[in-house]
């Protein structure tokens, strides 16, 4: 690979892969991501996308093999703790928290067992893919345990007699329920992040990062925002603006044949609920339209 091309590592397959691809494409990257290729070249920018296992991404960034990485915070933190124990470099820069990949790392026990608190795990066998995060949490609680390291299907460990509890990622809890387990304690909350190697980039690469970040921030802002149009009574503008979260300096235009109302356009930065629309209507607003925003640059 050309050392002057920006290198971005992302998950090849898994829960972050598709969302990461869509995010990069929405930022204007023209990428041909074929399943049989581990390196993809962005057609319209000097950028290479490396598609790797998610638990390899933090190390690639910390070792400065790649410039940027998109990775779950759970994997990032676990890798950092592991590398600290091995005396390896752990520095990186976090550029942006992303709005997907949300999950939690939780303790779970068999459904029929009573949960009396973390102290009940003293000396027990706990199956996990995240031994360092688990060890740190339990050490803070003064609890020692016997780790059972598994790389997959952690939830079957209690039924298989391998462990008495598990520590695993949870999204909806359906997998735990299907395996006769119940979630009892969240130990870490995670979402996807964009990270950068802790080094000074070539000027050409830094220019690309400087172009990427406003696009990325604009896309994330657009996802959180709605464009709202309505007819509003002039004497209620302040109250209506106060109802719309994040609304600043709405655009107000006169209506052709109504001197008591105006057309009001505003960008609200949070979800507009039905209850809010009902309150707007109660204040005299009409013809209320709520539209998604594809792109935004502040």
From Swiss-Prot:
Database matches in SUPFAM superfamilies: GlnB-like, Periplasmic binding protein-like II
UniProt entry tagged with the keyword ATP-binding: yes
Cofactor annotation: Mg(2+)
Subcellular location: Cytoplasm
InterPro entries: ATP-PRT_HisG_long, ATP_PRibTrfase_cat, ATP_PRibTrfase_CS, ATP_PRibTrfase_HisG, HisG_C, N-reg_PII-like_a/b, N-reg_PII/ATP_PRibTrfase_C
Any one of the GO CC terms: cytoplasm
Pfam families linked to this entry: HisG (PF01634), HisG_C (PF08029)
Nucleotide-binding keyword on record: yes
Membrane-spanning intervals of the chain: none
EC number(s) given by UniProt: 2.4.2.17
Function: Catalyzes the condensation of ATP and 5-phosphoribose 1-diphosphate to form N'-(5'-phosphoribosyl)-ATP (PR-ATP). Has a crucial role in the pathway because the rate of histidine biosynthesis seems to be controlled primarily by regulation of HisG enzymatic activity.
Family indicated by similarity: Belongs to the ATP phosphoribosyltransferase family. Long subfamily.
Name by which UniProt lists this protein: ATP phosphoribosyltransferase
Source organism per UniProt: Tolumonas auensis (strain DSM 9187 / NBRC 110442 / TA 4)
Chain's gene name: hisG
